[in-house]
């Protein structure tokens, strides 16, 4: 689920002369090389080592979408990885799917990705386990183009319309069809247009009638006269349309390494739990300040801070133990459109023995 492609933020300029994984970057890094994994975010966010770690560097890859980043950078900034004896290198990827591929391919030790990507990877034969949650709602809203805002007021109104998406076979496509069916609408009457990463402008210009976006694209479209038909970054909409919490971002590991890494995994979850608590306590400005300069270069930081202030309570849990029911809701959505086999169960890809232990 490449929600990082739909946020409306400009991405850092590619740094082409940086080496790949063999170069150590103390606190944050980048995975380069399309031969290794497709769609990596090629920028290095430099950090300063804050203390001696007891263990070797571990690499944790994750999506570079702005709303995915805070739990990990706030944890790092608070020194909680270091306090647990961990030397964690945060590896910024261009999307959740790329981070999942890096984990499955053995390029990184852990990956923080959307749960739908984990399920789809397991469906394709990958052997990975999800063991900790850092975002409990999908970072998505169905934005209506400004020129259609008065015409589209329900999922039934999507019949005969064109909806933009980054790529075919995505969670957003499944979610559209799933929600249309629940509303009694005919999903066969909607057209999906593949727009690639630059999805904001086509919606703003009315080249498509609607599209699944995240922030700040949603706020920018609202300023232009658009609106959200549904915003799953808000608890009320998630409860109304999805039935409650809907598992999104969290950390996974290769199943074969669980036994050897168990204590390390527990230390990682303890650090992240402290980071999630800090994320709710500190000022929104401090969240923005914790992000790497390369990531926020050219970004309206005041707007970004407002977004963190608005959504942090709804998006980020204070306890990262996996909610099995929330995970099953994701699986049900994917099964509806055949993205995973009917026999795939969310619980089979979870390791519930780590968090809280």
Positions of the model-derived regions?
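Short, glycine-/small- and polar/acidic-enriched structural segments
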Residues: 3-4, 53-195, 202-205, 209-215
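N-terminal secretory signal peptides
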Residues: 1-26, 38
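Sec/Tat-exported extracytoplasmic proteins
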Residues: 107, 112, 122, 162, ...
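Short, solvent-exposed loop/beta-turn-alpha elements that line the ligand-binding surface or hinge
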Residues: 83, 234-244, 313-322
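Secondary-structure end/capping motifs
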Residues: 258-339
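N-terminal export signals
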Residues: 22-23, 29-49
């Amino acid at each position: 689920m490449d929600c990082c492609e739909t946020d409306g933020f400009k991405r850092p300029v590619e740094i082409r002369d940086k080496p790949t994984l063999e170069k150590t970057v103390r606190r944050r890094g980048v995975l380069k090389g399309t031969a290794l994994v497709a769609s990596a975010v090629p920028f290095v966010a430099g950090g300063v080592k804050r203390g001696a770690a007891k263990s070797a560097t571990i690499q944790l890859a994750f999506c570079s979408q702005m709303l995915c980043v805070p739990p990990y950078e706030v944890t790092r900034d608070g020194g909680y990885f270091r306090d647990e004896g961990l030397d964690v290198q945060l590896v910024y990827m261009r999307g959740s799917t790329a981070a999942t591929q890096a984990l499955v391919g053995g390029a990184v030790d852990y990956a923080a990705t959307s749960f739908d990507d984990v399920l789809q990877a397991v469906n394709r034969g990958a052997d990975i386990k999800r063991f900790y949650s850092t975002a409990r709602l999908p970072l998505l809203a169905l934005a209506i183009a400004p020129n259609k805002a008065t015409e589209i007021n329900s999922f039934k109104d999507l019949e005969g319309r064109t909806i933009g998406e980054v790529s075919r076979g995505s969670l957003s496509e499944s979610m559209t069809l799933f929600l249309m069916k629940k509303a009694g609408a005919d999903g066969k009457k909607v057209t999906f247009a593949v727009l690639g990463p630059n999805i904001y402008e086509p919606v703003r210009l009315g080249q498509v009638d609607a599209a699944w976006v995240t922030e700040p694209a949603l706020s920018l479209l609202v300023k232009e006269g658009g609106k959200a038909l549904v915003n799953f970054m808000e608890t009320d909409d998630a409860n109304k349309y999805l039935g409650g919490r809907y598992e999104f971002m969290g950390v996974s590991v290769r199943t074969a390494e669980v036994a050897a890494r168990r204590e390390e995994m527990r230390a990682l979850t303890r650090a992240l739990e402290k980071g999630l608590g800090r994320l709710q306590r500190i000022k929104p400005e401090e969240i923005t300040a914790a992000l790497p300069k390369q990531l926020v270069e050219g970004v309206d930081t005041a707007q970004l801070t407002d977004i963190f202030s608005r959504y942090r309570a709804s998006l980020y849990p204070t306890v990262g133990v996996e909610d099995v029911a929330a995970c099953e809701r994701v699986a049900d959505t994917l099964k509806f459109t055949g993205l995973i086999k009917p026999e795939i169960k969310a619980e089979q890809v979870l390791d519930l023995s780590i968090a809280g232990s």
